Regions:
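N-terminal mature-domain "stem" immediately C-terminal to a signal peptide or N-terminal signal-anchor/transmembrane
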Residues: 24-83
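Post-HExxH zinc-binding segment in Zn-dependent metallohydrolases
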Residues: 26-48, 187-230, 295
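Pan-zinc metallopeptidase signature
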Residues: 59-64, 68, 228-300
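Acidic/His-rich structured neighborhood in mature extracellular/periplasmic domains
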Residues: 84-213
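Amphipathic alpha-helical surface "interface" segments used
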Residues: 140-143, 216-222, 282-287
């Protein structure tokens, strides 16, 4: 076969593999290709200004949700919920939205710093995928999440825009994780959140929940005993996403204990890049906990 033909065939095969790999992931493996989308913020404020002219009219359906990006579509289930729900929240919290307006319009200033976390992750985890980051305005119930469309950041919740790179980093790690099927146990969910905090901190320099960290370190023994007794169940109360305030405990102690598990696993590892891979691709969470050595004296 002529050498030129061989070269053309090789190039074609490489293109097929490249396109196939990109299609399977849906997103690029290059941090430079990730989009940071803030256009939904402008759409929200247009709807908000029109709403203020006549508060009996719900402008958020036609002017925001219907014309929003994939980020708005992805943030709607379980967060924005519906145009009617957003309308009712804005009516009740109109002044709160007004107070954060200036901050939301400055979010694009943090794109360069946020993208730097993507480069840092690429170094630690070459298999990382980099989806779009959508900054949207929601119903004051979520600071961020990730989904099949990408990363979604609730702009109205970001009272300090300097914290945005840390939020983006946390959600970026969630996007890379292998998630367990069904309803995750308290152990699984705590490890998932803790690993997003741990690796997110590595790539952004942003520290996690100070209140949970301080409380956890002060009451560690009691919390370890309680966690071990509950970790195989799916009741997150007093550990994740809410608290009864018993013992004056703060929210999200599961993040704290998950972080500790990950930190111990990483510290024990001789191959740090392999450890990052292991953390993002956990198959057996009980085995992972045992390998970390954390909580050994509490496990029976």
């Amino acid at each position: 076969m002529h050498q030129r033909h061989k070269t053309l065939i090789l190039i074609a095969l490489l293109l097929v593999f490249y396109v196939d790999g990109f299609a399977q992931s849906g997103f690029s493996y290059s941090p430079d290709s990730a989009r940071f989308v803030t256009s939904d913020i402008d759409k929200f404020w247009k709807a908000y200004d029109d709403f203020k002219k006549d508060t009996t009219v719900n402008t958020f359906g036609p002017e925001y949700i219907a014309v929003g990006s994939e980020g708005v579509a992805g943030f709607t289930p379980n967060r924005i919920q519906s145009a009617e729900h957003l309308y009712q929240v804005v009516k009740k919290r109109k002044d709160d939205y007004a107070k954060v307006r200036a901050n939301t319009l400055r979010i694009k200033e943090k794109e360069k710093q946020s993208r730097s976390t993507f480069y840092a992750l690429k170094y630690l985890y070459p298999a990382a995928k980099f989806p779009p980051v959508y900054f949207v305005i929601g119903a004051y119930n979520s600071g961020g999440t990730s989904g099949k469309q990408g990363l979604f950041i609730g702009a109205e919740m970001q009272t300090n825009i300097d914290g945005i790179p840390g939020i983006v980093a946390h959600e970026l790690i969630h996007f890379q994780q292998t998630w367990p099927g069904g309803d995750p146990t308290l152990l699984q969910q705590s490890i998932l959140e803790g690993s997003a905090d741990f690796i997110g901190e590595m790539i952004s320099g942003a520290h996690g929940n100070e209140a949970a960290n301080n409380y956890g370190n002060m009451h560690a023994d009691k919390l370890y005993q309680e966690f071990v007794s509950k970790m195989n169940g799916t009741d997150y109360n007093d550990w994740l996403y809410g608290t009864s305030k018993k013992d004056d405990r703060p929210n999200d102690l599961g993040y704290w204990i998950g972080y500790q598990i990950i930190a111990h696993y990483y510290a024990r590892a001789t191959d740090k890049k392999q450890a990052i891979y292991d953390i993002l691709n956990i198959k057996d969470y009980t085995d992972f906990l045992k390998k970390s050595g954390y909580l050994d004296k509490y496990l029976k």
